[in-house]
């Protein structure tokens, strides 16, 4: 984490439980990010918090630190049963739930508190086996949580801490009824520590906070601009016929260490994957059609650096904490202005610099005015020389459902085709 992204406030300055401080320092977390510096004084005083901060600013560690401290500082309720977790962390996607669980593991190891993970798609019996042994902190998606609750595998009557992460995304995905169902099975809001974090604190998110929290304090960390000043933005206007060749030429020129390419449909993503895999790039595909185990494997390979490029729909645009993404390519300009911000927010995180390249083609250029109005500035336009685009490209691979992952990256130096402008 870049020092320029941190405040002067140290975790050790707070009256945090010593085991929590020890775990943080073991991970070399000494200074707070702005959202942590604002939220922790409130949660440590037992106040509910609804926090807004740009993605990549430390929201996850803010609520994990608060959760572990609270459970270590407060006894469990009397007669707590083995199927009653003490804290519940709700996330909108399986990938985000898995990432939160991974971020919580060092704290769990240091404190002895037990973690549970519950998400749909696969692993029902494996997840259930962990729950049956008893967990202190349960992290999951709403559908699987409700499933376990209806089967009496979990009981929410002993919940002391509740976290709702990416609350605006919960609304977007239609999970609000599930959230309310789960809240109704918990103790009253005044008997819990409640935390809500979101990229935006819209009216409907504030309404949810009013409804389910106990006089929540609102904390906001607003960037100077929605897209983050460390992200270099660039825009090209290709024709539909030149769009794929321009993307491949830009990848050869930029040769990104770790890039995410976003497209608006799964079929477009599959097409991009086919072109890049045929050209020898180490590329993975992440769409809703990819099986859950394979999704997690691809994300792990991308995070480890075994894959250099991830082609994704907006299922991956929110909540994923993938370090050191150097480039984001918007192959299609998104229909939703907020998705543009969330997409390019995959790079330039936690004080690092990043590069966002968008292609405004004939099909999606009409989305540009609304995007630029939303972010409050024009995206700098670059020109390219059509004659310099790559044209000696292999025939794209066609996706086989049994193996949508990757191909070996070509050895040797990248082609030297320069763009103009």
Curated annotation (Swiss-Prot):
Catalytic activity as recorded in UniProt: ATP + H2O = ADP + phosphate + H(+)
Keywords: ATP-binding, Cytoplasm, Helicase, Hydrolase, Nucleotide-binding, RNA-binding
Motif (DEAD box): 165-168
EC number(s) given by UniProt: 3.6.4.13
One GO CC term, this protein: cytosol
InterPro entries noted in UniProt: DEAD/DEAH_box_helicase_dom, DEAD_box_RNA_helicase, Helicase_ATP-bd, Helicase_C-like, P-loop_NTPase, RNA-helicase_DEAD-box_CS, RNA_helicase_ATP-dep_RhlB, RNA_helicase_DEAD_Q_motif
Motif annotated as Q motif, chain positions: 9-37
Protein name as it appears in the record: ATP-dependent RNA helicase RhlB
Species the sequence originates in: Salmonella dublin (strain CT_02021853)
